[in-house]
Amino acid sequence: DMKVPNNGTIIGDDKNPGNMKDQAETGDYKNTSILSISLKDGERFYGGGSTSRDHIQHRGELLRMWTTYQHTEIPMPFMISSENWGIFNNTTRKNFFDIGNYQSDVFSIYNTTDEVDFYLMFGNSMPDVINYYTAITGRPYLLPKYAYGLCFGPNMLEDQFDILNDAVRFREMGVPCDLFWLEPQWMEKRYDFSTKKKWNYQKFSAEAYWDSTRYPKKENHRLLIGRLHGMGYHMGLWLCIEYDLSVPEEDALAKAMGKPLSGQEHWMDHLKNFVDNGVDGFKMDPARTIDEHPNFKYYNGHTDKEMHNLNQILLPKQMYKMMREHTGLRSWHHYTAGWSGTQHWSASTSGDNGGGRTALFDQLNLGMSGFLNTSCDVMNVNKDEELQSLHFGLFLPWVQINSWYSLHQPFYFPEK
């Protein structure tokens, strides 16, 4: 499994000015709250999202509910008991689940605020409880049919001719691939967080370079995306985002109430140009939405204490709404991070953690937390585990093979 890079930033995001963190881990103890529940002997607990990568049964563990790169990308403050009840701690602030860790017969939820808002759910079975939980936080997103086939990400040094060659050879070999996506090399500026990004016309001709300033955009059947569509493939693009996601939410509220809007741009809007070029969906990288911004004040007046975990819902929600409103269709899009509710807006992966043991625990824990569309970077494992990881990946709800810096095309492997 992949490890956290030494500089503490997201893999590939080399020019991050600094991944700052809020050093107040548990908040002001005078303004905190603890909810405690007595436990029965032998009672077991499941859920919590991707907060534990050692167990799927969490009694005896202390779980930290805070979205953190390569540690807890999709924490979900929800737990199910083998006694057919569950609890959802309805907050976006940092909180902790002590499930019989400090006291073996007590389940304590520690909130870094003096407010407590939770749901208790009782059912005839554990699936009943999950069903109640997703009734509150949102039913899992349904991807388009093609997204449940094989999604393949070529090496980030490949240009359009390499990718078209991959596409042709996949068809010749009978590889049932439905989607290719491009890593950061598709952008003119590497890791372009702005709303002014352009195609890297030196490598990719989704449109003629002389059309770069012409609007509206359209798909050209003679160029890259048109040719891939002609062979039965769909096309996705990698994205990185660092933006105040509260702006579109506040504008939506203001519009509904007949109040003035912010006048600020909405980050998702510029992606419509690429969709008009024929792009079918987007892979949302954790850079830098998953980073902490402790000194930033959001447009809605809040800080990262409330917004950090909430951002992991707002990003895929705003992607879903933009794509649905612009195309009228469900789209292929996924995001590494999450919180309770993200499952309603997007698919997910296990992030930059490979396709081995860590990914396996993530899939199981997320599944027990009502998150349906999960996957991982299949085959990003040690050499002797590659085919095992492929077999594992093909049994996931959706499957992606992410070459990124590797060469995972089947024709590069030995025949036996």
PLM segments and residue spans:
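Catalytic and substrate-binding clefts that recognize carbohydrates or anionic sugar/phosphate headgroups
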Residues: 1-144, 153-156, 160, 167-172
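Aromatic- and carboxylate-enriched substrate-binding clefts and catalytic-loop regions
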Residues: 7, 12-14, 21-28, 176-416
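A residue-level signal for beta-strand positions that form part of recognition/binding surfaces
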Residues: 84, 147, 330
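N-terminal small/glycine-rich loop or linker at the start of catalytic domains
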Residues: 136-153, 239, 245-256
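Short amphipathic alpha-helical segments
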Residues: 159-162, 311
